[in-house]
């Protein structure tokens, strides 16, 4: 047997061996993204609890800090998802994660706007008299935008679950939920 024939016969077996030993890139990507989303879902739950306490007794430093923390949380999550290698990953999975990142980038921008607004209130000035209740009213005006982002995120959750079922069947293994689990915000938005 000459070298080219040997390589032609061995190459498929070598590729199969590497795939088994290294794991499927889609499964690896999926699990890493799911781990990131689980971690940041838990962090967002803690942040929402803090915001609920602030809603009952608003303080400008607390509002500014919470909006900064929300923006930081979403930024860190986005950076971690962006750092994942997409080489040889199923395009449907990477497309979902990209759409998810774009949606939550809007949430991050909103949190950054609130942070800047509260910073101005903290500094005071002719246009910004430090008044927590007025600052909270400003949040109220953004509720509609928050609700719109959340509605789109819920639709994205449904798509993620359908994608999870499809890929689990295709790959013949159970995959963890991929989506960023949204905290319950009804009390916060009422």
Give, region by region, the residue ranges found by the protein language model.
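Generic N-terminal simple sequence motifs
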Residues: 8, 21, 87, 172-173
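Sec-dependent bacterial lipoprotein signal peptides
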Residues: 1-20
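Positively charged, low-complexity intrinsically disordered regions
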Residues: 9-10, 56, 102, 144, ...
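Short, low-complexity, Pro/Ser/Thr/Gly-rich segments in the mature regions of secreted, periplasmic
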Residues: 173-190
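Long, amphipathic, charge-rich alpha-helical segments that form helical bundles/coiled-coils
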Residues: 37-43, 67-70, 74-157
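Immediate post-signal-peptide N-terminus of mature secreted/exported proteins
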Residues: 22-75, 182-186
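Juxtamembrane amphipathic/coiled-coil helical coupling segments that flank
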Residues: 156-171, 178
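Generic low-complexity segments that are intrinsically disordered, proline-rich and/or Lys/Arg-biased
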Residues: 5, 13, 59-62, 127, ...
């Amino acid at each position: 047997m000459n070298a080219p024939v040997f390589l032609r016969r061995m190459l498929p077996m070598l590729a199969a061996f590497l795939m088994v030993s290294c794991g499927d890139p889609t499964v690896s990507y999926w699990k890493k993204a799911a781990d990131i989303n689980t971690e940041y879902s838990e962090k967002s739950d803690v942040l929402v609890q803090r915001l609920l306490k602030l809603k009952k007794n608003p303080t400008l430093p607390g509002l500014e800090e919470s909006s900064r923390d929300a923006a930081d949380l979403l930024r860190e999550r986005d950076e971690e998802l962006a750092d994942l290698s997409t080489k040889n990953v199923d395009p449907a999975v990477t497309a979902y994660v990209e759409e998810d990142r774009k949606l939550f980038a809007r949430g991050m921008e909103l949190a950054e706007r609130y942070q800047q607004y509260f910073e101005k209130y903290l500094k005071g000035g002719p246009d910004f008299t430090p008044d927590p209740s007025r600052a909270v009213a400003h949040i109220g005006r953004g509720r509609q935008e928050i609700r719109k982002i959340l509605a789109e995120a819920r639709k994205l959750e449904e798509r993620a679950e359908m994608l999870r079922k499809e890929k689990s069947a295709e790959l013949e293994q159970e995959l963890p939920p991929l989506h960023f689990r949204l905290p319950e915000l009804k009390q916060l938005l009422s």
